[in-house]
Design a protein with these regions (language model features):
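Short, glycine-/small-residue-rich phosphate/pyrophosphate-handling segment
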Residues: 109-135
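A cross-family phosphate/adenosyl-ligand binding-site feature
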Residues: 5-64, 70-71
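Glycine/threonine-rich flexible loop motifs
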Residues: 83-92
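Short glycine-rich anion-binding loops that position phosphate/pyrophosphate groups of nucleotides
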Residues: 54-55, 80-83, 154, 221
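C-terminal accessory domains and tails appended to enzymatic cores
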Residues: 142, 146, 152-223
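Hydrophobic/aromatic ligand-binding patch that stacks against planar heteroaromatic rings
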Residues: 97-101
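Hydrophobic/aromatic beta-strand patches that form the interior of the parallel beta-sheet core
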Residues: 14-16, 49, 76, 109-111, ...
Length: 223
């Protein structure tokens, strides 16, 4: 909601959001069950829809059904609850939606706040998102540019600025906690830690975030 209110300062906004939490859905699409779409709110220049599918489903629903041939000036995905730096971009539903939107030829940005707390302050991060939105709209980009933007936790006066950088090399080292349900059957919870393979590199998103900068990573689809 915080970034929606910021975006409204620039013009008409259409929000298409998943009905349920979609963390880790990456670029998944719904193929073997129907999608449902409902109107949640209409208020001035704001229209909000809820979609039963994945973040990428929401983008496809927007471009191929709701927009009816229109191309938005900018696609915004997020603000995500938690970092999408380094290899996490490949697991991210937030970035899956941003990348999908760029396929349609319009600029897009995925926004994430490096805070998993239930009391995370999205209002502060929305202030920084406003500058990114303003800069991208002012640049009048006519290419499918996609940015992965991560905002570190902190008060506005603690953030040192924006840093254009590259994706850090690393991987998640997972563990599975095994427990038993009331019927004695095993079930598992996934957990793990991120292993940074280049902790001393100063040109990466992980370094930028650890040193109080907002990381801005241009994303390319051609891998």
């Amino acid at each position: 909601k915080a970034v929606t209110e910021v975006a409204l300062r620039f013009g008409r906004v259409v929000v298409i959001a998943p009905e349920t939490t979609q963390s880790g859905m990456a670029h998944a699409v719904t193929m073997y069950s129907p999608l449902y779409l409902r109107t949640v709110e209409k208020r001035g220049d704001l229209t909000v829809y809820a979609c039963s599918g994945t973040p990428v489903d929401c983008v496809k629903m927007g471009y191929d059904h709701i927009f009816a041939g229109e191309r938005p000036a900018l696609n915004i995905s997020g603000i995500n609850h938690g970092s999408n730096s380094a290899v996490s971009i490949l697991y991210s539903g937030t970035m899956g939606a941003a990348i999908e939107a760029s396929f349609y030829g319009a600029p897009s940005v995925g926004l994430s706040l490096t805070d998993h707390s239930p009391d995370a302050d999205f209002e502060a991060s929305a202030l920084f998102a406003e500058k990114i939105i303003s800069d991208m709209l002012t640049a009048n980009i006519n290419e499918p540019v996609c940015l992965n933007v991560n905002i570190p936790v902190g008060r506005p006066d603690q953030i040192r600025g924006y840093r254009v950088c590259r994706q850090n090399r690393g991987y998640w080292k997972e563990e599975f906690y095994c427990r038993k349900d009331p019927r004695g059957k095993d079930y598992f919870w996934l957990t793990g830690d991120f292993y940074n393979q280049e902790p001393d590199a100063t040109d990466t998103d992980e370094w930028a975030l650890a040193n109080g900068y907002i990381s801005v990573v241009p994303v390319q689809v051609d891998m």
